[in-house]
From Swiss-Prot:
It comes from Mus musculus (Mouse). InterPro entries: NAD(P)-bd_dom_sf, Sc_DH/Rdtase_CS, SDR_fam, SDR_family_member_7. Its main location: endoplasmic reticulum. GO terms for molecular function: all-trans-retinol dehydrogenase (NADP+) activity; carbonyl reductase (NADPH) activity; oxidoreductase activity, acting on the CH-OH group of donors, NAD or NADP as acceptor. Disulfide bonds: none annotated. NADPH-dependent oxidoreductase which catalyzes the reduction of a variety of compounds bearing carbonyl groups including steroids, retinoids and xenobiotics. Catalyzes the reduction/inactivation of 5alpha-dihydrotestosterone to 3alpha-androstanediol, with a possible role in the modulation of androgen receptor function. Involved in the reduction of all-trans-retinal to all-trans-retinol. Converts cortisone to 20beta-dihydrocortisone in vitro, although the physiological relevance of this activity is questionable. NAD(+) binds at S60, I62, Y203, K207, S239. Belongs to the short-chain dehydrogenases/reductases (SDR) family. This is Dehydrogenase/reductase SDR family member 7. The lineage of its organism: Eukaryota, Metazoa, Chordata, Craniata, Vertebrata. The gene is Dhrs7.
Amino acid sequence: MSWELLLWLLALCALILPLVQLLRFLRADADLTLLWAEWQGRRPEWELTDMVVWVTGASSGIGEELAFQLSKLGVSLVLSARRAQELERVKRRCLENGNLKEKDILVLPLDLTDTSSHEAATKAVLQEFGKIDILVNNGGRSQRSLVLETNLDVFKELINLNYIGTVSLTKCVLPHMIERKQGKIVTVNSIAGIASVSLSSGYCASKHALRGFFNALHSELGQYPGITFCNVYPGPVQSDIVKNAFTEEVTKSMRNNIDQSYKMPTSRCVRLMLISMANDLKEVWISDHPVLLGAYIWQYMPTWAAWLNCKLGKERIQNFKNNLDPDLPYKFLKAKKD
């Protein structure tokens, strides 16, 4: 082979590879590392069997679907949230798979804001199953209100629930994992923990706090390579998170039903989460475009992202004031993409 031909082939590859990556990105519903793991990585069916998994926020949405898909893998489940009746419903749904028995699922009601109860809850799990292999920090609430109209108590509640509660439970479970020198801490964050948006200032703050905390904690536990961390950043997913979101008062939530057809199906989000857990990925972004693209812009071009955020934010706020879905701009952009 002549040098001229070799150089020509190298130049052709240099042109084709970026084009292939661009096409992959345009079709992506997660970051490319996660999608590569989905294609070539380890399967959850191989890696996550025979484990004890504790899921908070398990009464609906991502937490419920995660419990359901984990039940198919034959794990022992601990289901926690405040609503005991809903947890029992989720338990029945998991048992319908036929892979688990009553003794394999522990319903453990838990209020993340009641940090004094976390130590006893952890002991209850260890007494029931003898170990905790995976803690999934999924509990939390969102927010839909303007900063100047929002009572300070709402911001306190968001920090106490989304951040302090998660930190507290993690601190209770970690000594057990350190003693065993193994375990997984999975934290369901949000794209809002990367790219801040209007009407969710307190929620964004709590999610940014989680990102900083778990990145720092990971570095502190470097001497325990068997303890791994996975921070999951979903975009819009079909769930009740907006319906249950705080508004300007702690006692008020959105409670209005909105169109969720443009959001990612919960089952797809959870499947990608399981793949990230099976492959020990440290940080994963799970979202359709244009939100996924927005996360990349925030990461690599923050000045431009801030300008774009202000432009879209005006429309979000106007829709909110008109009692419309604030996310209509993203819905429109996704419809154009589809």
